[in-house]
Amino acid sequence: MKKKLLALLLACVMVLGLAACGGSKTEQPSSTGDSAATEEPAAPESTLHLGYDPNTGEEFYGPYYDEWSDMTDEELYEQALKEDTAINVYATSSKMLKAEEPFEEKYPGLDLIVSDLDTDEVLNKAQIENDTGNITADVLQTKDVNGSVFYEWYNQGILEPFYPRDICAHIDEGNLKYSYPLYASQAFWYYNTEAFPDGQPIDNWWQIIEKDENGNQKYRLFTKEIGQESSYMSLFASFINNADEMEKAYEDCYGEKLEYTYDPSSFNFEVPENNAGVEYLWRFSQAKMTFIGDGDELVLAVHNSTKEDPALCLASAGKIENQEESGYNIAWCVNLAPYTGLLNVESMFAVKGCNSPAGARLFIRYITGGADGQSGGLKPFTKVGNWPLRDDFEDKKNPKKLNELGAIANNLDDIYAIYPDVQDMWTYWLNQSPNK
């Protein structure tokens, strides 16, 4: 919200400044009345096709279709051979490297160059290249979990949308709203299957921080530091946006009204009172937990726990592979109330002003399955914990379908509006925790 308001204020200042310059003449207006002189200046028109325009305060959602959207693989390939044949991809997934050889075999004459980078590196390198006019990247692969890409990157002229119409026909439109998706993932709470052979010990988020009759925390908790993981911070922000659902989840679990114990007056911004999501953030920040940066070590901690000393950990869905690869006694906690988690979508972006615009779009089509879903591009990303979003692509890896796990779509608009405040609340309260 702070960022959007600042952008709008700056835009208003610019408009007022221009109006003041235009009205600086000392002559008095004609007595006959000139309607043109008294007309309000026309509202600025946006040139954006996707993203947030701070000049107009408008959001533009996908899917967006242009002349590129209807070009076939053959047409794009023919055009790609006439431009710079080196296609540079900045990716946050190392699995993207596996696409180089098969793509080049399928499209002789094109050279795919993949750089495996951190999320911040992908965006920062693209920004520096845009600012200096030395654009190397043609394609970016990353995910937007808190709305920063949608609200801050398209309007800088760094990215431009590409939605291939034939492929988008096989993807639910809700998953096309903010970007063009590669696949979806999410995080789960894990439990020890040996300690709880009858199934997951929790079915509600409030039970995670539950205390026993002696006032002791029921479960040892392991997680990455929430405030340093944007996807986790966004999840907690969603609880605040969905406070009614969080309150109902508490009442359904315990059969009584939720008592609000947090102090909203500790901050220099407005904190909603009697908000169940804020209450959960406060209580969670005061719980005893161990922060571990490595996901494999998180699930190992759960594997090593016992029924007498039970533990839960929050980790990415893909860490379930340790169940088979390492023999860990772990499983996901699914269908938690009010919802298990947020769907985080890995997305593909075309770089504006790149040297290989046709090649970039050909590769984006290829990596997301091509016209019939059988290009082979999705193969490296087909694993437990990744869910393809095409309805014509068979998911053989995951034990459950995406709609059977209790996750909800990520509402980036609402999360972006409060994300900085939620981060501040978490940091402040965590520093106050007696269990820190």
What does each model-found stretch correspond to?
Residues 17-20:
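C-terminal motif of bacterial Sec signal peptides marking the signal peptidase cleavage site
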Residues 22-25:
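Bacterial signal peptide processing site
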Residues 44-56, 60-63, 69, 405-436:
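Conserved C-terminal helix/tail region of periplasmic/extracytoplasmic solute-binding proteins
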Residues 49, 73-81, 91-111, 189, ...:
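Short, polar/charged alpha-helical segment
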Residues 88-101, 113-125, 135-297:
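Extracytoplasmic ligand-binding site segments that recognize negatively charged/polar headgroups
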Residues 147-152, 303, 310-331:
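A ligand-binding cleft/hinge motif common to bilobed small-molecule-binding domains
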Residues 169-172, 184-188, 280-284, 327-349:
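Periplasmic-binding protein-like
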Residues 341-415:
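Mature extracytoplasmic/periplasmic domains
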